């Protein structure tokens, strides 16, 4: 079977769905969207109910469930690396935190030759274009975009307010919008949830607009085997359908757009003969183009939890008990309200741990229950926790193809905690979190420290706790980076260096990981590049003001030292 389209998009994740929707707005353009996973079943509470966010991570239907190689600085642990599978990609299984990154992340990108139009003020119009915020638009937020964003409301859990107040009492700024004028500080955290209380994945927000268009063809359970080339030009894709072994072929008249994410995009390029020559040679893959940066520069956010018992019965611990869940589920299903309609990450913050950092290097998510991210090992009492992680680790990893078999996972190594700066940031972060948690605002609630525990104090004790307990925040990125240096894979429009008719558009093309969760920024990048592909003028630059700390101290005097 062979078909021909103008564009073939490989991967229906956050970026691929944006491109499929925007490109098919032009009625004379035909698009094939290939997705290795299945549909985003709207009746499956595991992906549709925000509070059920732990469930998709536990199975394989919606999760590629990659594992790292033994991480040498983490006691050789093989660490989890979940990625979304199905229409929506990782937006179908993520934590739904709507965080864009810091303005200075993008200004930093724009200092690289060829990336000058990636400054914050160039990107902000595309963040706004993608968003509908429930309380309306302003200079920073959109009012009519495909991504539904819900803000925390009065009357939510008192622990959220107490944790924000504790951050302010510890001497840090208060901010009313982590995506607005000032990211630095503590405040409410927005989430990608619809007004009806459903997960706002990109299958819902974007693809629902485009599914009925005659110029869009969506094929699920389609695992791309390799990109087809004529010389240096991408001309199509060979893919497997379901469990079959007979490849189908589709041809692209204009471009092949790789949107498979930071793990699978470099894997697919390498399998197709675009990557480091020595690696291709070792696997007997005919080299189409020697591009050493494919799979290099891999970055992620690492985080850990500090957990406390709660002296008052105000945590959502009862909601983890099966006998309370039918009522929560019914309220969510029929009314779109209640505990089920929230991801429970309704407060957070960003701080600088030392003067050397020009913008925040630590992120907090606050959660009014003590439990693991994937729903396991819940503490059997009322509790709460702070997720704390460093934002711009100097550690760099890599993705290496292990086999020409498209169903075999690649070798993944993040090299977590391979720099002294990593250890300094995490030790500082744990100690500062304890100071925050010890402020008067939490006195009515704070019981004993459950984790790490009061006996974990010295550098050596903290380091061993980090080695054993730090986990991924599920933010792999930067493995096909934008730029013009020898290790760059794509230019500022996502076009693969040295190739024709081939782009990569997803979190893998970030040159440097951002300060915060990745989904909102991945959507923004796809919106921006979609205009380029369509030959449209970029949206006018924003003139919004944004905070630069400059000489401001990292914190003021705490209420309780």
From Swiss-Prot:
**What EC number is given for this enzyme?**
1.1.99.1, 1.2.1.8
Q: Which coenzyme or cofactor does it need? A: FAD
Q: Identify the pathway.
A: Amine and polyamine biosynthesis; betaine biosynthesis via choline pathway; betaine aldehyde from choline (cytochrome c reductase route): step 1/1
Name of this protein: Oxygen-dependent choline dehydrogenase
Q: Where is the active site?
A: 475
Cross-referenced Gene3D superfamilies: FAD/NAD(P)-binding domain, Glucose Oxidase, domain 3
Role description = Involved in the biosynthesis of the osmoprotectant glycine betaine. Catalyzes the oxidation of choline to betaine aldehyde and betaine aldehyde to glycine betaine at the same rate.
Q: Which family does it belong to?
A: Belongs to the GMC oxidoreductase family.
Q: Which organism is it from?
A: Pseudomonas aeruginosa (strain UCBPP-PA14)
């Amino acid at each position: 079977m062979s078909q021909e389209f103008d564009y073939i998009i490989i991967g229906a994740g956050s970026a691929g769905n944006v491109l499929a929707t925007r490109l098919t707005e032009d009625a004379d353009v035909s698009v094939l969207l290939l997705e290795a996973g299945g549909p985003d079943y709207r009746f499956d509470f595991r992906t549709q109910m925000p509070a059920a966010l732990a469930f998709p991570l536990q199975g394989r239907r919606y999760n590629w469930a990659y594992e790292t190689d033994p991480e040498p600085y983490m006691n050789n642990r093989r660490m989890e690396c979940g990625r979304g599978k199905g229409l929506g990609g990782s937006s179908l299984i993520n934590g739904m935190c709507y965080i864009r990154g810091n303005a200075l992340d993008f200004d930093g990108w724009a200092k690289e030759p060829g990336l000058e139009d990636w400054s914050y003020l160039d990107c902000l119009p595309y963040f706004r274009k993608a968003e509908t915020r429930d309380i309306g638009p302003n200079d920073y937020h959109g009012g009519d975009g495909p991504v539904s964003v819900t803000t925390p409301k009065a009357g939510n859990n008192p622990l959220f307010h107490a944790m924000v107040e504790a951050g302010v009492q510890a001497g840090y700024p208060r901010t009313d919008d982590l995506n607005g004028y000032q990211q630095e500080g503590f405040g409410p955290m927005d989430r990608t949830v619809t007004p009806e209380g459903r997960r706002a994945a990109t299958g819902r927000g974007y693809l629902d607009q485009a599914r009925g268009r005659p110029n869009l063809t969506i094929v699920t359970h389609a695992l791309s085997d390799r990109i087809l080339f004529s010389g240096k030009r991408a001309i199509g894709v060979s893919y497997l359908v379901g469990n079959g072994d007979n490849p189908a072929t589709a041809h692209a008249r204009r471009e092949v757009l790789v949107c498979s994410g930071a793990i699978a995009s470099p894997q697919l390029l390498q399998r197709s003969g675009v990557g480091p020559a020595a690696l291709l040679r070792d696997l007997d893959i005919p080299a189409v183009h020697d591009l050493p940066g494919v799979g290099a520069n891999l970055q992620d956010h690492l985080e850990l939890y500090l957990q406390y018992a709660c002296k008052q019965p105000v945590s959502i611990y009862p909601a983890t008990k099966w006998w309370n869940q039918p009522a929560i589920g019914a309220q969510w299903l029929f009314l779109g309200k209640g505990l089920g309609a929230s991801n429970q990450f309704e407060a957070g913050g960003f701080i600088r741990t030392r003067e050397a950092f020009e913008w925040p290097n630590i992120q907090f998510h606050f959660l009014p229950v003590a439990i693991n991210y994937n729903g396991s090992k819940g503490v059997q009492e009322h509790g709460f926790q702070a997720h704390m992680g460093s934002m711009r680790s100097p550690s760099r990893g890599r993705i290496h193809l292990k086999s020409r078999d498209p169903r075999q996972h690649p070798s993944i190594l993040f090299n977590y905690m391979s720099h002294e700066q990593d250890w300094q940031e995490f030790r500082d972060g744990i100690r500062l979190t304890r100071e925050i948690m010890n402020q008067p605002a939490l006195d009515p609630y704070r019981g004993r420290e459950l984790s790490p525990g009061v006996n974990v104090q010295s550098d050596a004790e903290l380091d061993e706790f980090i080695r054993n307990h730090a986990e991924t925040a599920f933010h792999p990125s930067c493995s096909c980076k934008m730029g013009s240096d020898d290790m760059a894979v794509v230019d500022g429009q996502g076009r693969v260096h040295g190739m024709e008719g081939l782009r990569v558009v997803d979190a893998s093309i970030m040159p440097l990981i951002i300060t915060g969760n990745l989904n909102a920024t991945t959507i923004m990048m796809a919106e921006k590049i979609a205009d380029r592909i369509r030959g449209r003028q970029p949206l006018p630059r924003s003139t919004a003001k944004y905070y630069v700390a400059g000489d401001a101290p990292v914190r003021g005097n705490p209420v309780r030292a």
